[in-house]
Amino acid sequence: MTVHFVMLPMEGGQSHVAVNPVLVRCVQPHGPTQAEVHFDDQHWLVIDKTMEQVVRDLEIAGR
């Protein structure tokens, strides 16, 4: 199983968090430079990447 690491904004800076692309249900834009990564109805993250960057990262990770 491939796990991709994304940069997540956190207090005091950014941190790498592992995201399994299989768990990602959808990605939505969140402003011009951020994306929301949704795992289910209750769990989602906002990350400092565009939606296009996130989708490309997940495609690479899923190979």
Residue ranges and their predicted role:
Residues 2-63:
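Acidic, Ser/Thr- and proline-rich intrinsically disordered linker/docking segments
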